[in-house]
Regions:
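Hydrophobic/aromatic beta-strand patches that form the interior of the parallel beta-sheet core
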Residues: 4, 33-35, 95, 156, ...
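Helical hairpin unit composed of two closely spaced alpha helices linked by a short loop
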Residues: 116-157
Length: 247
C-alpha cells in the first residue's frame, strides 16, 4: 500500500479534501477507515452528507445547516439517510478518538478489525508520536508507512506546511512541517493553497511512481456539496468574482 500526504497551511481545506477523497472511495463501494483526530464523528458525517446529497438527493444538505440543526427539511434528510443504505455498498468507519490517544498501534488494530480498502488520517501531527521533536515525528512517519506496506492498504494523511512556505505560490514536499522524513517516506505528496473563497490550487509535489509537478484547480463550495476540478481560466474567473465580492 502507498503512503500519501495532503499538505497545506491551517484552514486551507485539508479535511475537506480528505473527506472528498473518502467519498470518492465510497462511490466505488470501498470500505473506508477515517481516523478523525480533530473533529467528532458527527462533524465528519455531516460533511460527508453534504457531498453525498449532491449526488443522491434532490436537495443538497449544507454542512452548516446540519450542524446548527435548522434551515433544512428534517423529513427529507431522514429519507436521504435511509436511501443511502440502498445506494452505497461501501462502509464509512470513523474513529474519532481524542487527539494524543491515537498511535500507530491503535491504527493497526483498527485496520485488523475493519479490513478497510483505504485509510485516512486527519491529521498526522496529532497522532501520539512519543515526543515532540523532529526525530519522534520521523519515527512516526516511518511507522505509518510501515502500516501501509504491512497491511497492503493505501494510507492518506493530512499534514501541515511549515512557515517557511508562507508566500510561496505552491509549496513542495520539502516544506512539510515537523520533519523532512514525512516527505521522504511518502509515495505521493499533494500540496494545496486556497486562492480565494471558492478556489483551491493543488500541486502534485511528489509522485514516486511517475512524473510530478502537475498543477490543477478545484472549485471549493463544501456547503453546497461541490468540490470539483475546473480549468485554469474558470478558476481565474472565480477568483476575480470572489475578490470583487470581498471588496
Amino acid at each position: 500500500g502507498d503512503y500519501w500526504i495532503v499538505a497545506a497551511r491551517l484552514g486551507q481545506g485539508k479535511t475537506w479534501t480528505l473527506i472528498r477523497m473518502a467519498v470518492a472511495a465510497l462511490y466505488a463501494d470501498s470500505t473506508v477507515l477515517y481516523c478523525a483526530l480533530e473533529q467528532s464523528r458527527a462533524q465528519i458525517a455531516m460533511r460527508c452528507h453534504s457531498f453525498l446529497s449532491g449526488k443522491y438527493s434532490k436537495q443538497v444538505f449544507k454542512t452548516l445547516d446540519l450542524m446548527h440543526g435548522k434551515d433544512f427539511d428534517l423529513v427529507a434528510y431522514r429519507q436521504f439517510l435511509q436511501e443511502l443504505k440502498d445506494k452505497l455498498d461501501g462502509r464509512f468507519i470513523v474513529n474519532d478518538t481524542s487527539r494524543g490517544r491515537v498511535s500507530p498501534s491503535s491504527i493497526a488494530a483498527q485496520i485488523e478489525r475493519n479490513r478497510p480498502d483505504i485509510v485516512f488520517i486527519d491529521y498526522l501531527t496529532l497522532i501520539n508520536s512519543g515526543g515532540d521533536d523532529w526525530r519522534a515525528m520521523a519515527d512516526l512517519s516511518g511507522e505509518i508507512k510501515g502500516l501501509a506496506m504491512r497491511y497492503e492498504v493505501p494510507i492518506v494523511a493530512a499534514a501541515q506546511i511549515n512557515r517557511m512556505a508562507i508566500g510561496n505560490d505552491l509549496p513542495g514536499a520539502e516544506h512539510l512541517a515537523a520533519s523532512d522524513a514525512i516527505g521522504q517516506d511518502a509515495d505521493c505528496v499533494i500540496t494545496m493553497r486556497q486562492m480565494s473563497q471558492r478556489v483551491i490550487k493543488m500541486k502534485l509535489a511528489k509522485f514516486r511512481h511517475g512524473m510530478d509537478g502537475q498543477i490543477w484547480f478545484n472549485e471549493f463550495a463544501p456547503n453546497s456539496g461541490r468540490f470539483e476540478e475546473v480549468s485554469g481560466d474558470n478558476a481565474q474567473d472565480l477568483i476575480d468574482e470572489d475578490r470583487s465580492n470581498a471588496d
